[in-house]
């Protein structure tokens, strides 16, 4: 990779970003699903910064227990502290830990990059929550052995001994979490019932010759609940016809969109890859949001691409935008690409096409406030 590395340095020349590192990852037998997602996360700057901060504050703890997050922090630190600007790194410790922890990733079979991303983010959240709880328990034990709180110098007994626990919000939530609101309107009494739910990514159904904007509109389209799908209205105290729609109540800072390219075909009894052409813009305006976030804008910075004609075989690569340059990561290989090359990964407008490189997971960063 020395030649390829020097080629990349030559291509960037004096435009090589100060302090940045572009390293390919070694493949340990079908670990491209992991490599492509890790590259996208490394170039998700807020995620990288938090992880490096975590590494710095934890490396002094001699008896720190190894977990997936410490292995990931170690890998990111290894990349960022390289003396060389380009090269190849073997994420061996991380991959070994992943396989040890989850049997799903143990085989040499083709794995799903979206499943891996989901698992990784949820695992990091679990680790951070456990650590936050342990710190809180330690703090509470040392600060007070009495179950009573002190307010203005007076002891205030807790109501019936009930402690209201606030949910722990980690930095992963601050970066990736958004809130969806599910609105259901009873067609008899017009009462609107709203139910909120959080998300770390949005999985969108796709159609041929469509765009992310139209997929998002479909995601938020109004659905009528009738016949056996009637809605139980609390006000009418009975099953009623209703209209239901999903909107984004709070958009995340980093919006991750998963395109549902693998569809189960009943007649075939198996999954099929949808190679549909779905345009994903470099700048995205969200229109299915609730005030005050109307028309919040996002900029694309990474794409995980699935290469291949079927769901059970193929390859994953990633496209990453770093300091206004677009880079193509294919395991050990890293090269510079033109921004216009991104559109070659939209998909195919014909059913059968020689182009099998399709955008699968998209990473967008908010250009405005989402807090």
Curated annotation (Swiss-Prot):
Q: Which residues form the USP domain?
A: 23-367
Residue stretches spanning the membrane? none
Q: Where does the record say this protein resides?
A: Nucleus
Q: Which GO terms describe its biological process?
A: protein deubiquitination; proteolysis
- Which residues bear N-myristoyl glycine-type lipidation? 2
The signal peptide, as residue positions, is none
Q: What is its main location?
A: nucleus
Keyword Repeat part of the UniProt annotation: no
Entry annotation: catalytic residues: 32 (nucleophile), 315 (proton acceptor)
Reaction(s) catalysed (UniProt annotation)? Thiol-dependent hydrolysis of ester, thioester, amide, peptide and isopeptide bonds formed by the C-terminal Gly of ubiquitin (a 76-residue protein attached to proteins as an intracellular targeting signal)
The organism is Arabidopsis thaliana
Name recorded for this polypeptide: Ubiquitin carboxyl-terminal hydrolase 3
**GO CC terms of this entry:** nucleus
Specify the superkingdom.
Eukaryota
SUPFAM superfamilies given in the database record: Cysteine proteinases
The EC designation for this entry is 3.4.19.12
Q: Where is the motif (Bipartite nuclear localization signal)? A: 83-100
Q: What is the lineage of its organism?
A: Eukaryota, Viridiplantae, Streptophyta, Embryophyta, Tracheophyta
Substitution effect: residue 32 to S: Loss of activity
């Amino acid at each position: 990779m020395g030649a390829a590395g020097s080629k990349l340095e030559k291509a960037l020349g004096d435009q090589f970003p100060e302090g940045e590192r572009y390293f390919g990852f070694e493949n340990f037998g079908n670990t491209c699903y992991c490599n492509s997602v890790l590259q996208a996360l490394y170039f998700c700057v807020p995620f990288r910064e938090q992880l490096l901060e975590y590494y710095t504050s934890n490396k002094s703890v001699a008896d720190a227990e190894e977990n997936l997050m410490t292995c990931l922090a170690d890998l990111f630190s290894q990349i960022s502290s390289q003396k060389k600007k380009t090269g190849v790194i073997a994420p061996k410790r991380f991959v070994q830990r992943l396989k040890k922890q989850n049997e799903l990733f143990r085989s040499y079979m083709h794995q799903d990059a979206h499943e891996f991303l989901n698992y990784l983010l949820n695992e990091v959240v679990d680790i951070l929550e456990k650590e936050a709880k342990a710190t809180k328990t330690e703090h509470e034990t040392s600060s007070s052995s009495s179950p009573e709180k002190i307010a203005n110098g007076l002891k205030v007994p807790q109501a019936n001994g009930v402690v209201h626990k606030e949910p722990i919000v980690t930095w992963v939530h601050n970066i990736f979490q958004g809130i969806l609101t599910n609105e259901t309107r009873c067609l008899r009494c017009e009462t609107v019932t709203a139910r909120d739910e959080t998300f770390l990514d949005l999985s969108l159904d796709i159609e041929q010759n469509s765009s992310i904007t139209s997929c998002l509109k479909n995601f938020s389209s109004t659905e009528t609940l009738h016949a056996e799908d009637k809605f139980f209205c609390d006000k009418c105290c009975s099953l009623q016809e209703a209209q239901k729609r999903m909107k984004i109540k709070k958009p995340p800072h980093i919006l991750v969109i998963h395109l549902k390219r693998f569809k189960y075909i009943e007649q075939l009894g198996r999954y099929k890859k949808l190679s549909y052409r779905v345009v994903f813009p470099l700048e995205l305006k969200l229109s299915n949001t609730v005030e005050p976030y109307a028309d919040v804008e996002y900029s694309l910075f990474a794409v995980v691409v699935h290469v291949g004609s079927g769901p059970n075989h193929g390859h994953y690569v990633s496209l990453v935008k770093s300091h206004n340059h677009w880079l193509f990561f294919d395991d050990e290989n890293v090269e510079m690409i033109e921004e216009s090359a991104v559109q070659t990964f939209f998909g195919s407008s014909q059913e059968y096409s020689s182009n099998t490189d399709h955008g699968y997971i998209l990473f967008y960063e908010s250009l405005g406030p989402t807090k």
